[in-house]
């Protein structure tokens, strides 16, 4: 049985993120990962969740409210490249995990999507804020215009990281369909 990339990402995050930790959902979308992270960090942890689009914030706010998790999350309507502008001073260097879903908000305007430049800026920022051990998970959806280019840029960037400080894993499912999503895991081991 094949495990979905989302499940693989969640398994990796679950093995790293503990109650009381700090996490980032860099692309909140419809709030599924934000909710997942909020459950893991518990009442004493915190999640910073980013998206540019108001419908994403509304959907995520409702999902968190319905699950009694809203108080654990800071919803931020801004680009994920601005993470450092919103992080509380006492959370710097304490981010245990961050999640990205690269692409566009399902069911919305497909012209509004993540871009390589801002994604790489966010990743570089997160590396400086990440705890050790720490984990960054990215699922790159490649079936839309620009999707494969962004995935390739992120993989190229990840493969340049110091092997003494980071362990990089890339999962690309055997072509069950054209342009499958790709999972990139970056683990801080410094």
Label the predicted regions:
Residues 21, 45, 134:
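Glycine-centered, small-residue-biased loops immediately flanking beta-strands
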Residues 1-22, 26, 32-35, 39, 57-94:
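S-adenosyl-L-methionine
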Residues 147-190:
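Class I S-adenosyl-L-methionine
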Residues 38, 118-132:
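A short glycine-rich, Lys/Arg-flanked "PGG" loop and its adjoining helix->strand segment in the class I
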Residues 99-122:
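Mobile active-site "lid"/loop adjacent to the S-adenosyl-L-methionine
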Residues 27, 129-140:
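Conserved beta-strand signature within the Rossmann-like core of class I S-adenosyl-L-methionine
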Residues 46-51:
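Conserved SAM-binding motif I beta-strand of class I
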């Amino acid at each position: 049985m094949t495990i979905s990339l989302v499940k693989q990402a969640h398994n990796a995050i679950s093995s790293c993120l503990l109650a009381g930790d700090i996490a980032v959902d860099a692309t909140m979308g419809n709030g599924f990962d934000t909710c997942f992270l909020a459950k893991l960090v518990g009442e004493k942890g915190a999640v910073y969740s980013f998206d540019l689009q108001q419908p994403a914030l509304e959907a995520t706010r409702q999902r968190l409210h319905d699950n009694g998790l809203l108080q654990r999350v800071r919803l931020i309507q801004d680009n994920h490249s601005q993470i450092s502008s919103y992080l509380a001073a006492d959370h710097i260097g304490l981010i245990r995990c961050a999640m990205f879903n690269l692409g566009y908000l399902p069911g919305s305007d497909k012209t509004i999507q993540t871009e390589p430049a801002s994604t790489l800026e966010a990743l570089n920022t997160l590396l400086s804020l990440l705890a050790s051990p720490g984990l960054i998970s990215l699922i790159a959806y490649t079936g839309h215009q620009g999707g494969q280019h962004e995935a390739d840029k992120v993989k190229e960037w990840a493969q340049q990281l110091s092997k003494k400080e980071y362990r990089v894993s890339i999962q690309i499912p055997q072509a069950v369909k054209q342009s499958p999503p790709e999972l990139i895991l970056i683990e801080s081991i410094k």
